[in-house]
């Protein structure tokens, strides 16, 4: 179990000591998606979902979730986040909304869990906003696509293109 930093020598969970690590600029990008009926996506894009403006609510939910990550994931360190962006990319051909969260900090540990949590909760908010019209939505493909900063350097998931067109960026 030597590769698992969250376990002590007895295999018990612990919060990793990061106090001796150098503070560096860190960034993580995560993505996920919500698949839905084509009619549901049309309602979202037309601003006709009965509960209100879906992307605005989901964006705020994702931002709030990133800030609450240490309250949800037991061994995460509370961090001073310096930036959180949550964006959406509708994909009518596949009847889905793609979600991207970018989280930044200058600190002693990374923000991967914060980015993943932001995407997941933004997806849950989309589900909540649209469940009255589509209970068959599927949340999925939540993944880390980029990580930079710290001793381990840069991670880039192969096959992930940069987003050029996004919805709700105003």
From Swiss-Prot:
EC class: lyase
Pathway note: Cofactor biosynthesis; molybdopterin biosynthesis
Record InterPro entries: MoaC, MoaC_bact/euk, MoaC_sf, MoCo_biosynth_MoaA/MoaC, Mopterin_CF_biosynth-C_dom
Taxonomic source organism: Pelotomaculum thermopropionicum (strain DSM 13744 / JCM 10971 / SI)
Assembly, per entry: Homohexamer; trimer of dimers.
Protein's name in the database: Cyclic pyranopterin monophosphate synthase
Entry annotated with the keyword Lyase: yes
Domain of life of the organism encoding this protein: Bacteria
Its EC number(s): 4.6.1.17
Keywords for this protein: Lyase, Molybdenum cofactor biosynthesis
Main function: Catalyzes the conversion of (8S)-3',8-cyclo-7,8-dihydroguanosine 5'-triphosphate to cyclic pyranopterin monophosphate (cPMP).
Annotated positions binding substrate: 75-77, 113-114
GO terms, biological process: Mo-molybdopterin cofactor biosynthetic process
Pfam families: MoaC
Lyase recorded as keyword: yes
Catalysed reaction, written as an equation: (8S)-3',8-cyclo-7,8-dihydroguanosine 5'-triphosphate = cyclic pyranopterin phosphate + diphosphate
Residues in coiled coil: none
Gene: moaC
Gene Ontology terms for molecular function: cyclic pyranopterin monophosphate synthase activity
Similarity field: Belongs to the MoaC family.
Catalytic residues (positions): 128
SUPFAM superfamilies given in the database record: Molybdenum cofactor biosynthesis protein C, MoaC
């Amino acid at each position: 179990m030597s590769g698992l930093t969250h376990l002590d020598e007895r295999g018990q969970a612990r919060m990793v000591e990061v106090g001796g690590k150098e503070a560096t600029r860190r960034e993580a990008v995560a993505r996920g998606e919500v698949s839905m009926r084509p009619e549901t996506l049309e309602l979202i894009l037309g601003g006709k979902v009965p509960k209100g403006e879906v992307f605005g609510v989901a964006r705020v939910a994702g931002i709030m979730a990133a800030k609450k990550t240490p309250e949800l994931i037991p061994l995460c360190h509370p961090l001073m986040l310096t930036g959180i962006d949550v964006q959406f990319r509708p994909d009518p051909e596949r009847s889905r909304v793609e979600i991207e969260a970018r989280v930044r900090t200058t600190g002693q540990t990374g923000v991967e869990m914060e980015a993943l949590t932001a995407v997941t909760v933004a997806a849950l908010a989309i589900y909540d906003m649209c469940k009255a019209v589509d209970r068959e939505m599927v949340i999925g493909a939540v993944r880390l696509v980029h990580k930079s900063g710290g001793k381990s350097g840069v991670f880039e998931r192969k096959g992930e293109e940069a987003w050029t067109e996004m919805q709700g960026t105003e």
